[in-house]
Amino acid sequence: MKRQFRGAAFAAAPFLISSAAHAQWSSPYTAPRNAVVDAAGAKSIEVEAGAGLLRVEGKPGLRQVQVTGTARSSSQQFLTRIKLIAERRGDVVFIKADIPDDERSYNDENHSASLDLVIEVPQGINADVSDGSGDTKITNVGSLDATDGSGSFSVIGAAGSVRITDGSGDLTIENVGGDVKVNDGSGDINVRNVTGSFTVESDGSGGIYATDVRGSVVVQNDGSGSIEVNKVGKDFRVESKGSGSIDYTEVSGRIDIPERHRDRRDRSYR
């Protein structure tokens, strides 16, 4: 392997807002949007976030979902219309950033509106997350099904399976107790320490980097960017590959990659 896993530094560092991201979402008018929802007996949490930063953090022993939000807008009038919906719907805790459609501009010349959310949930609860734009970090949940528009997206700790559909921005996934499936538009994909298999169903551009996957690694369709895998417990398969290199080390099972990559890559097989 010629390259170290890019996500390692990310995992070791705290979740930081870059100066560029902060400038993008900073607005002269802000207001708190907080809520607490009883989570006793809840099986899952559903989050619909729009523009803004998002954290979903699993906490041991927690019996409530605690939401700490900050509404931001370039207009006081717009600010009052940014709402937080937090309620129990049967065995689901539902959280929504309610930003009226006519205010969903992303820091254009007229105005900006966003709602940053930090959501603390019972550790291991299943999560369904939909996010528009802005950086997202999810930690210590159960299974996860997520859709993300733009911005970096990280998952650090999921007891079950993880499925992510991502538009643009780097994607980091670590410490997963089940399978991982990804559909990605652009940006690097970094995966580490997966108990199950890792499948990239579709990737437009950007590198794919995986290490410590106990199951198989399967790339069904990759447009451009390098693919590098290390320490795969079962098979490694690339079904369709555009431009970019393929490197692999310590693959225990069968290797099946496009013909043009085989001769120069077979030496990487242990």
What residue ranges belong to the model's regions?
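Bacterial N-terminal signal peptides that target proteins for export
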Residues: 1-10
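Acidic (Asp/Glu) and glycine-rich low-complexity loops/linkers
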Residues: 2, 21-131, 137-147, 154-166, ...
